[in-house]
């Protein structure tokens, strides 16, 4: 077995690189064709999702295979090899098997335990089978990966450790609130009609949204999805809603208008450019207001007093009414900081800050100095003395300290919630900075998932993966010696046929009954002699390090290498010509 995988994923590369390296359907087909046309690779399959691009191949040379597969990935992704290489990972033989089985179980997903990857692996295998780039090794590998993934989900609680990317994204949008409560009654827009968009629409329907609008470049696909939603969730969607059309389809050019009505939008189109720019989103939320995010000032001051703290005077407040310092130049700054516990606004220089602090603590001498309008060395000396007296009275000496941050003015509550599940992104990242909009995209999901708790069932799945990798390796090593065993039995059959022919020459009067009996007896003797050695050699070959037994068998019986190779090629050709399961 010479299985090699070269790839990159959300674990090895930043989203900015994954976006640029994404492969559309045509690029995947061309990549497969070019891979099997390359010298080191005999089979190939590509697994491309939102969060990973992996090229699997059966190669005869490791280093040449790594170089060729890396070059092909760079060539077809459009990202230069020099830039792409630091983010690539390589797995070989049993490690490659372990990697794919872990991926199939959801252990390597952004949301641990999500089951959508199984469908993507199945599609990957079907694509390779359609192009006849998957032979015996990759057929066995991917089909076993699907079985391992299903076993993990059925025998453990891995589903409780994770969820679909859609559900996780909605949880991030709801900011920790119950998703069903948060979604109930909202109007939803789903952009795209592929598998991820369909899953998003179904998840929103189950969560209890009031209306779902589906937009897609191919209007017929949008209509089909809307019809399915009506059939499956129409009754639930109609609860508490008096509209006649609860799930409907619109063309892509209707998206800007629909976005002005939507409360939540999910986009996953696979487009190469942006579907929603920051300007277009800003235009849709202009004039829409949500619940205020800032509590009333009186409520805040009450909370401060209840906490046992002294409210800090700020620029423009009533507390500044008699302050001798001119704070008008800095009163418009929305954020501030405090020094020595005294309030100040951003924009004060150090001297002004200390004078304001002294006045706030009752520095009447400062007031008198300012009111007198005096200046010069004597006035400065008097001012310094007043500040020193104030410091003595309040029990501390003024000191320079690093400003302590004060929270900026809170953003208004969102009126539009956007979930971008596309790679490359559908929604401009600049939307994160728009007031009134909450955007969750692949990058923010990656950050959030890094802190997600892991379920105990994950350990059980890891044990399943380890056991399945060992079993698969044993089966492959045993299968590797099969062509040699077949060639040995073929040689034995030729020997039997030759000896029977020679016997007929010596005994021309032998009747058919006796000839058949003699032939059968000789065959039984040969089969019995070969049975124990061939069974045992398969067992030995299945063990780690058993690859050498095939060579030993060929040497012992002087088997023709080309005969063995022809048997192997015939088996592989049969697998490649086998259509999707």
UniProtKB/Swiss-Prot annotation:
Region (Insert) residue spans: 292-416
Q: Which UniProt keywords apply?
A: NADP, Oxidoreductase, Porphyrin biosynthesis
- Cite the Pfam families for this sequence: GlutR_dimer, GlutR_N, Shikimate_DH
Q: Which GO terms describe its molecular function?
A: glutamyl-tRNA reductase activity; NADP binding
Enzyme Commission identifier(s): 1.2.1.70
Q: What is known of its domains?
A: Possesses an unusual extended V-shaped dimeric structure with each monomer consisting of three distinct domains arranged along a curved 'spinal' alpha-helix. The N-terminal catalytic domain specifically recognizes the glutamate moiety of the substrate. The second domain is the NADPH-binding domain, and the third C-terminal domain is responsible for dimerization.
Known role: Catalyzes the NADPH-dependent reduction of glutamyl-tRNA(Glu) to glutamate 1-semialdehyde (GSA).
Name listed for the protein in its UniProt record: Glutamyl-tRNA reductase
